[in-house]
Amino acid sequence: LGMEASIISSIGNDSSGELLIKQIKKFEINTTNIQKHPSLKTGEVKIVINENGIATYQILSPVAWDEISITKSGFNEVKKSSAFVYGSLSSRNEHSKKTLLELLKNAKFKIFDLNLRPPHYSIDTIKLLTKNADLLKCNQEELLFLSKIYGYKKNDLKQIMIFLSEKTNTSTICVSRGENGAILYQNGDFFEHSGYKINVKDTVGAGDSFLAALIYFQMQNFSLEKSLKLACAMGALVSKFDGANPKISTNSLISLAK
């Protein structure tokens, strides 16, 4: 979509790391703050796609991104950025968790993309990262998990979102609902989109693309309703193709979102 982006992470001193950097640069993403670990290998995830196009993940450990260090360059990158997106997976190791918490202190707008990948999380860490967020993005299962760990008994989606917003002081919560679209809550108001009917080929990357589009259009001062509609369109388009990063044209996005 054209927004300038930068990644803070760590790769191994290996061929996989070199290949990853080349691939990231193809998308014109700043790799300055991707560190090279002297001993741990580049992260690897084994993905299995079922007959419905739904993915399951086996995330190897330990890997280079378990030991992301704080650097002056990374610190400054976060400080100057309009938004800082972080996930829960990177906090499975204390080294990277400590770095993340330091970076969050200087972020202007903090976006938490919750990804529960057992056994790579702890409840205390999830609570800590949620309370740091200005915007929380999760799916329905993850929302129910959050309501459970905070002791909320009801199953109504909207009531859970209101409760969590008040409990964690998170002003905006966005819940993706797969083929049924998404719902967003901000300061007492709800925005919903029912999604787009498409032939799903591969869901890997759809959630990330959805969030990226939501952030982009919000940064372009689109209304929340319009931003959510376009984000759902982006997630749907990505699901039509194999792989997490298919090339999606602006025209195809706008055409689907009409």
How would you label these PLM feature ranges?
Residues 1-45, 49-54, 62-64, 256-258:
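Substrate-binding N-lobe of the ribokinase-like
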Residues 11, 89, 198:
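Hydrophobic pocket-lining residues within nucleotide cofactor-binding pockets
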Residues 14, 40, 140-141, 208:
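Alpha-helix N-cap/helix-start capping motif
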Residues 17, 43, 100, 143, ...:
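A general structural signal for well-ordered alpha-helical segments in protein cores
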Residues 23-36, 51-191, 222, 253:
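Ribokinase/PfkB-type carbohydrate-kinase core domain
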Residues 46, 57-60, 193-194, 214:
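Beta-strand scaffold of nucleotide-dependent catalytic cores
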Residues 154-258:
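Conserved phosphate-binding/catalytic region of the ribokinase-like
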